């Protein structure tokens, strides 16, 4: 019965007698896998696997040298692939031949388990693979009784304990254990001409006891416990005569099919035996490996591929081939089966030794087009807004969980199976609908129409005096940082007020109701306009008197110097409210944009008044844009003063605007009044950025008015003040311009004025297109590539690696495998399950190998080695990335802006913050 068990019979679990289990003691996993071969890896206990009855029949046919006869009954209820739970794995070795085989206990999944949206995490530990070993095929001299075993010099120095070369000749005694725990003693000596490593005394006894012949292989392993292990791997010799006590080939085929069909119909456990040396291919593979190959890789006829094969002395080599067809191996008995469904043609002349058909999970296509993104729940490139339905009213769980598995039309079991964690179909991702946020799809067209309807109301740039550069050299700049913070405080309160109303206004408000509310608030604001004008005139007169008295104290040469430096400054009305540009409506229709965005008559401003709060005299375009701004003017673009040395970014930004800000009481009083009458407008109703920041920017610094036409209105790019939601028009190439935002003033006030948590998360709208970049953003983008890159792996210390030493991904993977003891596993992630990911300069986590090599070298920040368990655990959102030391989600404006600027990527709809391993 021993041969029948090892050759692949199927037994019910309850019928597994003690005779079938030859050894109760646990075998060494390293030695067992070394004897099985470098391409063999048993699935972990507790994991989900896919069992192929076709492959099991091939093992029986290879062991008995007899194919399955046609008269064997068919089992229509047995699917071509059976998804099972692996309950137990026992490694065995034949006591006489040392032939290794494994006993597996499987149980088909129930219909309820097939509907689980997530693949459970693998609880069992992976079988240990050998790392420090060598294998040699025996020659005729190695098996002779009067000779010894010649060990290659490099292998002896790598595996055997070091010799004492002070002795003559250097020699030592080695004690090695085989699979059954038997100890074998050998004398290791370094002698001969030329000198070589030999095993002499005890070797002939071992060869005779194991009945080794030329062509068999012997392998030695030095494990972590400083023990020497010994194993053998016999050459494949087909048996010509089968023992009479062994079951016939037909009986074995019928037995395995009947047991599998019974287990599939009753959801009962059954036991199989897997012989890795006799089976042509693995017929029990992990479910994740099967899904990745079948549903995540698209192949076609004519595509080139490569496949791993075992060669002499336990080495591995890739052979190239071409896909010549895709069809069922046995369409009559096993329709719609993925077992050996790919016809291939091999390049080399020795192709006759290889199978003409292979399975999808055995090959590695050279040019692959993934059907889904990579199986990692990374960050979304475009975060989904908070509070909105995912797919126009669909359930959020349908998108936050991963996409349901692609259905198999021929298998009812696969039709109900959902596979989670392997990404989202790109064409299934939701398209953002502006109507959900209360935005009109033709908002830009409406604004353009209002600007061209009445050419007489188009204002010349000369009328917009607050946009023109003014000579303010005679004004004193005595504002302190505390005064600046007090000025910004009302703006921040107003912004926070609008953010709080966003959640209640964004749901259930129709567009007509929103416009009517705007109209009512605009009218109430217009009624308060005379009072604001009276206060403005009083404050202007007081400000003029103070400025005249202060100018008398400033030396004349300082005034000239200030006048020279400040000539190019743009005058900025820092306290302008989004609704300060509105006047009385000229029409009464609440459904037209002209009612909400009326025209105002041009007025002139005094030269000494920089930031008046009277109704603005801006162009129609400004009147149209300002009411839709969701925050106070905070993004200013202005030159940096060259006469004042500043040591830090805060000082540079403070000094740059100190001379342009009005006095504190004026701004504070005006903003308090505006804050009390601030209309309740959803923040999400702000206009999206105008396409292309460079289209309105004169990069050469020229002030050609024709280059600044916006909807028929001349706009000077150097003096234009852009409110929140519109990018700065300052030229990017201007070295004296600094990006300026409210976050730079609010950094000391983070504890007193925290941002709304909805903005602090990564689930809010992506404003990377219209939120100005922070001051250090250009430094990050233009930063030179680092020479040394940190490499991380769970359970080990991180290593620094100079990636400039390598010229290809293959060299990098090979070096990483050597550093972390993963030789041969990082080169083929499809088979081993180990994955390499890296974090680029923009904090995106990407797969190593997807980009051109030079682009990868220039953008890599750090590298992370993920084990197969980590790859499978990443199928659940936040599970692995949240455990990594990442950037903490703060509540400051700087953190918010930097998060919005960072690009994000994810396969699931759930988004996380910036990731740093």
Curated annotation (Swiss-Prot):
Belongs to the ARF family. The lineage of its organism: Eukaryota, Viridiplantae, Streptophyta, Embryophyta, Tracheophyta. Residues 786-870 form the PB1 domain. The gene is ARF17. GO terms for molecular function: DNA binding. PANTHER family: AUXIN RESPONSE FACTOR 17 (PTHR31384:SF22), AUXIN RESPONSE FACTOR 4-RELATED (PTHR31384). The keyword Transmembrane does not apply. The keyword Nucleus applies. This is Auxin response factor 17. Residues 571-649 are annotated as: Disordered. Auxin response factors (ARFs) are transcriptional factors that bind specifically to the DNA sequence 5'-TGTCTC-3' found in the auxin-responsive promoter elements (AuxREs).
């Amino acid at each position: 019965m021993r041969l029948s068990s090892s050759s692949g019979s199927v037994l019910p679990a309850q019928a597994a007698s003690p005779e079938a289990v030859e050894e109760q003691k646990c075998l060494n996993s390293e030695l067992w896998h070394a004897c099985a071969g470098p391409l063999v890896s048993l699935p972990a206990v507790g994991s989900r696997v896919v069992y192929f009855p076709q492959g099991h029949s091939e093992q029986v046919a290879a062991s008995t040298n007899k194919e399955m006869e046609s008269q064997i009954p068919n089992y229509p209820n047995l699917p071509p692939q059976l998804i099972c739970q692996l309950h137990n794995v026992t490694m065995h070795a034949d006591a006489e031949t040392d032939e290794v085989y494994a006993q597996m206990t499987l149980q088909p999944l129930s219909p309820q388990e097939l509907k689980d949206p997530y693949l459970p995490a693998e609880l069992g530990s992976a079988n240990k693979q050998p790392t420090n070993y060598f294998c040699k095929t025996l020659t005729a001299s190695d098996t002779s009784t009067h000779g010894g075993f010649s060990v290659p010099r490099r292998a002896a120095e790598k595996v055997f304990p070091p010799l004492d070369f002070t002795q003559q000749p250097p020699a030592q005694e080695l004690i090695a254990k085989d699979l059954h725990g038997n100890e074998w003693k050998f004398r290791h000596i370094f002698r001969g001409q030329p000198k070589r490593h030999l095993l002499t005394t005890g070797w002939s006894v071992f060869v005779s006891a194991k009945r080794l012949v030329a062509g068999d292989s012997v392998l030695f392993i030095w494990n972590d416990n400083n023990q020497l292990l010994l194993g053998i791997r016999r050459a494949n010799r087909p048996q010509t005569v089968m023992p009479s006590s062994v079951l016939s080939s037909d009986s074995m085929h019928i037995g395995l099919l009947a047991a599998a069909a019974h287990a599939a119909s009753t959801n009962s456990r059954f036991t199989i035996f897997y012989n890795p040396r006799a089976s042509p291919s693995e017929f029990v593979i992990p479910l994740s490996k099967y899904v990745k190959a079948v549903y995540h890789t698209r192949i076609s006829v004519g595509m080139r591929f490569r496949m791993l094969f075992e060669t002499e002395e336990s080495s591995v080599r890739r052979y190239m081939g071409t896909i010549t067809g895709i069809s069922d191996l046995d369409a009559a008995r096993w329709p719609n089966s993925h077992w050996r469904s790919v016809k291939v043609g091999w390049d080399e002349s020795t192709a006759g030794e290889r199978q003409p058909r292979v399975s999808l999970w055995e090959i590695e296509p050279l040019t692959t087009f993934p059907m889904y993104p990579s199986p990692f729940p990374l960050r979304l490139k475009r975060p989904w807004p908070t509070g909105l339905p995912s797919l126009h009213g669909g359930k959020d769980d349908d998108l936050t969980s991963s996409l349901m598995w692609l259905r198999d039309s021929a298998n009812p079991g696969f039709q109900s199976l959902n596979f989670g964690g392997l990404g989202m179909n790109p064409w299934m991702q939701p398209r953002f609908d502006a109507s959900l946020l209360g935005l009109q799809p033709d908002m830009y067209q409406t604004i353009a129409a209002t600007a061209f309807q009445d050419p007489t109301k188009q204002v010349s740039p000369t009328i917009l005096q607050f946009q023109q550069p003014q000579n303010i050299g005679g004004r004193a700049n005595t504002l302190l940082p505390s005064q600046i913070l007090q000025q910004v405080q009302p703006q921040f309160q107003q912004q926070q007020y609008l953010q709080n109303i966003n959640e209640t206004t964004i749901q259930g408000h129709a567009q007509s109701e929103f416009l009517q509310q705007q109209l009512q608030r605009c009218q109430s604001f217009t009624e308060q306009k005379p009072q604001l004008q009276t206060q403005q005139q009083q404050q202007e007169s007081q400000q003029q008197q103070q400025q005249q008295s202060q100018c008398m104290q400033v030396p004349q040469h300082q005034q000239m110097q200030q006048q020279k430096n400040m000539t190019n400054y743009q005058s900025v009305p820092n306290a302008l409210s989004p609704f300060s540009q509105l006047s009385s409506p000229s029409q009464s229709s609440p459904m037209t944009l002209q009612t909400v965005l009326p025209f105002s008559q041009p007025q002139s401003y005094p030269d000494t008044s920089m930031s008046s709060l009277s109704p603005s005299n801006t162009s129609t375009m400004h009147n149209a844009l300002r009411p839709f701004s969701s925050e106070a003017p905070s993004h200013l673009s202005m030159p940096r003063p060259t006469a004042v040395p500043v040591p830090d970014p805060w000082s540079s930004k403070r000094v740059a605007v100190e001379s342009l800000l009005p006095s504190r009481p004026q701004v504070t009083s005006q903003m308090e009044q505006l804050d009390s009458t601030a209309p309740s407008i959803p923040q999400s109703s702000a206009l999206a950025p105008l396409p292309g920041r460079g289209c309105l920017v004169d990069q050469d610094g020229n002030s050609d008015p024709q280059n600044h036409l916006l909807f028929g209105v001349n706009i000077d790019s150097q003096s234009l003040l852009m409110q929140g939601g519109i990018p700065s028009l300052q030229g990017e190439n201007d070295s004296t311009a600094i990006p300026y935002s409210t976050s730079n003033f609010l950094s000391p006030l983070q504890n007193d004025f925290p941002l709304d948590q909805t903005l602090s998360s990564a689930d809010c709208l992506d404003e990377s297109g219209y939120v100005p970049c922070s001051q250090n953003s250009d430094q990050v983008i233009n930063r030179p590539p680092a020479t040394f890159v940190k490499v991380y792996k769970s359970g080990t210390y991180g290593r620094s690696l100079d990636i400039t030493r390598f010229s290809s991904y293959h060299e990098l993977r090979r070096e990483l495998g050597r550093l972390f003891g993963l030789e041969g596993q990082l080169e083929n992630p499809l088979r081993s399950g180990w994955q390499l990911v890296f974090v680029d300069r923009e904090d995106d986590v990407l797969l190593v190998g997807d980009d051109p090599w030079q682009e990868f070298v220039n953008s890599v920040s750090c590298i992370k080695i993920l084990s197969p368990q980590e790859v499978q655990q990443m199928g659940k959102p936040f599970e692995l990335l949240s455990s990594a030391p990442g950037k903490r989600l703060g509540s400051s404006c700087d953190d918010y802006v930097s998060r919005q600027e960072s690009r994000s990527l994810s396969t699931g709809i759930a988004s996380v913050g910036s990731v740093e391993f």
